[in-house]
Amino acid sequence: MNQRDTLWILTAVLNATNCSMQLEHSSSFILRPNNQVVVFPFIFRGCNIAVLPTAKHSDLRRNPKRMEDSEPLFCNISHIIWSFTIGGVAYKDDDRFKRLFSERMEGYLKDISSNTSKVYMKGNKTFSEFLEAVYKRIFQCDGKRGGHVMRYGEDVMKEIGGMMENAPPELSEEEKRQHQRLWGNIKKYTEYLYNIERLKHLIEVEKMVCDACKEICLGLREEELMGLLAEGRMRKSLKMKLGDEEAGKKGYLEYAIVNDEILLDAHREYGGEVTKELVMQMLLGKKGEEIDKRYINKVANMIKERQRRREREIEKRVKKLLRDEEKAKGRKDGKKKSVNVSEVKEEESETEEVEAGEEAEMPSMEIGGARRKTGKKSRGGRKRYKIHKRVSRWRKSPEKIKEEWDRESEERWRGRSLEEIKEQKVFHDIAGVLELLRSEDADKFFIDTGEYTKGGSSRGRLVAIGVLESGEKKMLGVVEVGTFKDSPSGCPVVYHLMFRVTGIEEIGSVMSPEFAEANDIEKIDEDKEYQDMGKFVYPKGTEYEIVRREQSFQIVWGNPFDTSEVLCRLTIQCRPCVI
């Protein structure tokens, strides 16, 4: 890193509690030439989401906790954006730049924060629209000499010129030449920062990112959005710099460093779908600096293939509808048309051919980023697990479950009423999930949150996003799988399995391996009272069906006396693809 980079540092704001630049905590990063900082229109607190791009202020008012996380940020939003995008000159034993900022920019930014926040709080704008408005107000370039920021930039360059001309007299001739070179480089970098085209690009790129984030949130189903946020929870740049403790105290914005020229060119050439996918990949953890023309072409080709597959699927459905209409019309006319075997075979082969073609043309990609191997492989590539008695117990009748829990030492379940056991059976009697867990596709659905130690044993935790439908209730949440290693075989034993109802706002905390509610079992009973999962069967009279789709895994429990009646349905969502 050279001296120029050392002096030009952007301060990313975390714990902004007032409208001044005096912050309790901050983090610094280098902004190099040809790069811009884009800010995502999400407010985070720790790993959790506090405000979505689509959130209006009226939505926040209904949730006091979200208001508490976001209000300090609103009142200081302009200073935060300034710190992300421009920053300032730091020079030891000389506060001239700090004084210049206080005189020329402090009030300007304070007014913008106040005015834009009032409009957002009283109006009908979304948070992404609010962020766009802040950028436009700060970096407006339509006035004389390019606006207030450009004029301030000219003043900064004058001060730098003064530093170049007035080198400290005690310096030697060689040190004076170094002083001149240093401040000459700083002047060039300042000219770049306050270039009118760069400021226009700042506004344009931020609008592009805000629009894409809003479309992502509106276009995804709730469980898909939760999967996106779950996948990206550990891949936050600012949070990583500050650590969990600091990032958990106040609301903060996340950022990416990108080449604005490349992003703008991609948007003009390929349109909004490719831009949206690029932004989604950054939310999943793709580094903005890694997005080059080659990567953009790869994403564009993937989007084209996705659209072709969608068109083929629509065409296939239309053909089926037309065939169904013809059959219905034939029955109505009283003409019984028998479909000969060759026609049926032709229809089947057509479907198989389309599906095979789709499979062959799927671009190579990873599911959810780098995949960790979970479980011990058995023959045929399937993973081997054992089931602890505290998990297999839930397959029994509520009466039997209560009887067994009352005999156990685990305080959490002992003494529960029969009604409570019946309610909890819906969330815990999901052993059909283990079929997916031991399959080769497990990593496409489950996120390995990492290992941790509790009660003297090493434990692991797998989490998948899902939707549980029981009766008239439809619940969004996660499927949790807690494991420990069997000794001496090393085979994972599933000691915890349940569906946990979870909202989007809490998904970050729930994804943590040390999530308190999931791991409140201090000591695991390792008395060998568990069975090999390959031998697991549901008791007689229980009917359930597994439905495998490209983007989901579904377990359907039916009434054994009436197969048309669905008692419960659990759908596990596939992890988003990292390109």
UniProtKB/Swiss-Prot annotation:
Compositionally skewed regions (Acidic residues) per UniProt: 345-360
Biased composition (Basic residues): 329-338
InterPro entries, per the entry: DUF3654, UPF0329
Ranges for region Disordered: 325-360, 370-389
UniProt name for this protein: UPF0329 protein ECU06_1620
A Pfam family: DUF3654
Similarity remark: Belongs to the UPF0329 family.
Upper classification of the organism: Eukaryota, Fungi, Fungi incertae sedis, Microsporidia, Unikaryonidae
Entry coiled-coil feature ranges: none
